A protein has these predicted regions:
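Alpha-helical transmembrane segments of multi-pass integral membrane proteins
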Residues: 749-764, 789
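A loop-to-helix transmembrane entry motif
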Residues: 777-787
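Conserved cytosolic headpiece of P-type ATPases
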Residues: 1-733, 741-742, 755, 769-770, ...
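Hydrophobic alpha-helical transmembrane segments and their immediately adjacent juxtamembrane loops
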Residues: 736-750
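Long hydrophobic segments that form regular secondary structure
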Residues: 766-767, 771-775
Length: 875
């Protein structure tokens, strides 16, 4: 049925009108989100709090280097800074390039328009306001506009409202007053699922609805990531501790030496002043050394390396991470706000159940095949099935396909005499065919069950039985469809509407159709809930449908009440104070609009929640952008993907649970690295400080510490970052944002092990100092090597910190650690053998190497014994 405006003939715009319209209203292109320049992307890496502390240390080191004309230490510190920032920049830049390939926007898609009275195809980007566009089934609407003609037109608005099927018409009598957008309007980015129409373009590019949402999605969220907050606190702590100890050391030692010098010497000429300057400079250098030793130069690079390695490995689990911090932030999330269509469900209508007359399988098959305008697309094995046309009709064809029936063969063999397409007014579709199966002319009808049953010969008992079944389906938020047929005499009318109106049809049964939940979703939701993560469904669907989906995935429980669900309109009516009181209790928000979802995210954040948002539509973009982690779908719109941090390539909620596991495991690995790293810094700092009190030469130089803090720690970070994630972390509750990254157990380990190492090293230092020949470069080389080897063996203990596992329990884990350990050991041998003046070392004989390696290995064995005792205690 066609609905026309008063215009009987549409000629479209002339060439001159097209040019004028483009000048006045702009082009049909969405302004892409402003991407930071390459330099800005790189400079962002200097916002890392530990990098900033390093920069301060580098400035002090540079001052000393200029005075002494020895630049090795300063170069080392700057190398540390540029290496850490460079790695972070490279991996984010690389991810952005991959993302751009994934998100190629089809602005060249051809669109059929009427211009100069002729039908022609032009690229989507060339559409202008005033253009007359012809819309056919399966096509995407290229701009916003008003319909001037609509024939059985149905539109998939899920990218904007979450609605899969919206009826469109130009007949005011059939306008849907509750629709999000007027019934005679169509929006850019939506898809024609059934029928066809003609529209007049009213808005293009950024002026379209999709353009407005895209603009809101580029507003930057000011939320700091949980890891960033913790690293800032850690950097402040290290910075304050390092600078305080350095300042006190400088004041105490300078005061002592100056007092001793000035009590015996009278300052009369510049020679004495030069000696005073030498004393001040000597202890200023010591203070700078203490700062450099206190600051873990390798920490930012190691964290970056851990994040970067996780980015790569998460890609294998269908998580394309675009923003590096998102790897870890996923481990801290406390709430997931997810849309329904395509994330929890398969975004493919399917027959849930068929109550049909099983004695008539051939008639049912022919009726479904012939009385349909939909098509199934050819797919390779294993690929998700899909079709073109009405989603309900596609569901019936898929059901038929599953029965081993070839719908195309049946459709081609049944000669269509007449067809009455579905309309919202009639609520049925009818097709008259010459049936090769029955060798008769048959009228097939399908539509709303109550309409179809009204045309059939059914008694009250049969109608009551079907109505009871229909009510059960509708309570589960399913669509229902009835089918019937009638044999038509050859000399009868071939007007479908007239034949249906006569009644007397035979009812063949009912179908219950739904967009089924993904099979892995209930388990994934359960995992998230056991991990202490709240799941909230935010959808444009009806309250009934949204609640039913929540029930099916295990989110909605029998004890839940109206307090646990709300509609978008009701939510918008609440004040911020009222909404804040309810947000944590909400499980379902239905009829939600884009701004409702964004407001929900921001209110949850005000309550202290760390929020992840999933979405595939343009309507999800503002919320995706404001959440701590935005998760878009691989098949989602370009606007949604641009606003997100992670793209789920398989569109599955299950991948979110996997990402949480990765994030939590990554945080534990970073904590393990901090245990390893800070043990080194505590030992080094106190060694230098106590060495000064004992009156020895600086036991560790800045260049030696840069080797330990940079190169050795980089390999250690790689080893710890490569530890496989464990499902055990999903049994824990999310960490609180206020919890410091260094836990009491970590603090005890750092100072317990550190003080043990310090006692050994100080004993060694005192022994060397009291030798008759005194302490020389050989002794300092032995001291440096023992210091490194103690940390070397402690790396193995750090890799299983937080567990009672033996390092040898997992062969692949032990092998990975061993390969890194060999690299570190070879590096230490090379530095000792060839470091010379730069590293203040000299080569050691083989027997000393064996004594040092064997003697320091007690660190590993004590760790193994301690974990073994704890395992026995837990039995």
């Amino acid at each position: 049925m066609s609905q026309n405006t008063n215009e009987s003939h549409l000629t479209g715009l002339t060439d001159q009108e097209v040019i004028a319209s483009r000048e006045k209203n702009g082009v049909n292109l969405l302004t892409p989100p402003k991407r930071p320049s390459i330099w800005k992307l790189y400079l962002e890496k200097f916002q890392d709090p530990v990098i900033r502390v390093l920069l301060v240390a580098a400035v002090f080191s540079l001052i000393i280097s200029i005075i002494e004309n020895e630049y090795a230490e300063t170069i080392g510190i700057f190398f540390a800074i540029f290496l850490a920032t460079g790695i972070g920049f490279y991996f984010e830049y690389d991810a952005n390039k991959k993302f751009d390939l994934l998100n190629a926007v089809g602005e060249e898609t051809p669109v059929t328009v009427i211009r100069n009275g002729k039908i022609k195809e032009i690229p989507r980007k060339d559409i202008v306001v005033g253009d007359i566009v012809i819309l056919n089934t399966g096509e995407e609407v290229p701009a916003d506009g008003m319909l001037v003609e609509a024939v059985s037109l149905q539109v998939n608005e899920s990218t904007l409202t979450g609605e899969l099927m919206v009826n469109k018409t130009t007949d005011e009598a059939h306008f849907d007053e509750e629709a999000t957008y007027p019934s005679n309007s169509v929006m850019r980015g939506t898809t024609i699922t059934d029928g066809h129409g003609i529209m007049r373009v009213e808005r293009v590019g950024d002026a379209t609805e999709i353009g407005k949402v895209a603009r809101q999605s580029t507003e930057q969220s000011q939320e700091q990531t949980p890891l960033n907050i913790q690293l800032t606190k850690l950097a402040n702590l290290i910075g304050k501790a390092g600078f305080t100890i350095a300042a006190l050391t400088f004041i105490i030692f300078t005061s002592k030496d100056l007092y001793q010098y000035l009590t015996v010497t009278e300052v009369t000429d510049w020679h004495q002043w030069l000696e005073i300057a030498r004393i001040v400079l000597k202890y200023f250098m010591m203070a700078v050394t203490l700062i450099v030793v206190a600051v873990p130069e390798g920490l930012p690079m190691s964290v970056t390396l851990s994040l970067a390695l996780n980015m790569r490995r998460m890609l294998k689990t269908n998580n394309l991470v675009r923003k590096m911090h998102a790897c870890e932030t996923m481990g801290a999330i406390t709430v997931i706000c997810t849309d329904k269509t395509g994330t929890l469900t398969q975004n493919l209508m399917q027959v849930y159940e068929a109550q049909v007359d099983e004695s008539q399988p051939e008639l049912i098959a022919e009726g479904i095949a012939a009385n349909s305008t939909a098509f199934l697309e050819e797919k390779v094995e294993g690929e998700k099935p899909s079709g073109v046309g009405n989603p309900t009709e596609i569901a019936l064809l898929l059901w038929l396909n599953g029965k081993g029936q070839n719908y195309m063969k049946l459709r081609e063999e049944a000669k269509v005499i007449n067809q009455l397409t579905f309309s919202t007014e009639r609520k049925y579709m009818a097709t008259l065919v010459d049936s090769p199966i029955q060798k008769k002319r048959i009228l097939y009808i399908k539509g709303a069950p109550e309409i179809v049953m009204g045309k059939c010969n059914l008694d009250k008992a049969q109608i009551d039985k079907y109505n009871e079944q229909l009510l059960a389906y509708q309570n589960k938020a399913m669509r229902t469809l009835g089918i019937a047929y009638k044999v038509i005499p050859e000399n009868a009318s071939d007007d479908c509407a007239e034949l249906v109106g006569e009644g007397g049809m035979t009812f063949l049964g009912i179908f219950a159709i739904s967009d089924p939940i993904r099979p892995d979703v209930p388990d994934a939701v359960k995992k998230c809930q056991s991990a202490g993560i709240g799941v909230k469904i935010v959808t444009g669907d009806t309250p009934g449908t949204a609640t039913e989906i929540a029930r099916q995935i295990g989110l909605w429980q029998p004890e839940d009440t109206e307090r646990n669900r709300i509609t978008g309109v009701e939510f918008a009516a609440l004040s911020d104070e009222e909404a804040l009181e309810r947000v944590l209790d909400l499980k379902v928000m239905s009829r939600a609009r884009p701004m409702d979802k964004q407001r929900l995210v921001q209110l949850l954040q005000q309550k202290g929640a760390v929020v992840a948002v999933t979405g595939d539509g343009t309507n999800d973009a503002p919320a995706l952008n404001h959440a701590q982690v935005g998760l878009s779908m691989g098949t989602g719109t370009s606007v949604a993907k641009e606003a997100s941090d992670i793209t789920l390539l398989d569109d599955s909620f299950h991948s979110i649970a996997t990402a949480v596991m990765w994030g939590r495991s990554l945080y534990k690995n970073i904590q393990r690295f901090i245990v390893f790293q800070l043990t080194i810094n505590v030992v080094a700092l106190l060694s230098v400080l106590l060495g000064a009190f004992f009156g020895t030469a600086l036991p560790l130089t800045v260049t030696q510490m840069l080797w330990v803090n940079l190169i050795m720690d980089t390999f250690a970070a790689m080893a710890l970052a490569s530890i496989s994630p464990s499902m055990d972390v999903m049994n824990e509750k999310p960490r609180r944002r206020t919890d410091f990254i260094i836990t009491p157990a970590m603090r005890n380990n750092i100072f317990g092990v550190g003080l043990g190492f310090l006692a050994i090293l100080m004993g060694l230092l005192v022994y060397f100092k009291n030798l008759p020949s005194g302490m020389d470069t050989h002794h300092l080389t032995v001291f440096f090597t023992i210091f490194v080897m103690l940390q070397f063996w402690n790396l193995f203990n750090a890799s299983v910190f937080g567990t009672n596992h033996s390092i040898f329990k997992d062969a692949s884990h032990a092998l990975g650690m061993l390969s890194v350990a060999i690299i570190i050991l070879v590096g230490q041998i090379l530095i000792v053998s060839f470091g010379g003046k730069v590293f203040r070392t000299e080569p050691l004989p083989l027997n000393e190497w064996l004594y040092i390696i064997g003697g320091t290995s007690f660190v590993l064995w004590i760790g193994e014994i301690w974990r073994g005792i704890k395992r026995l205690g837990n039995k």
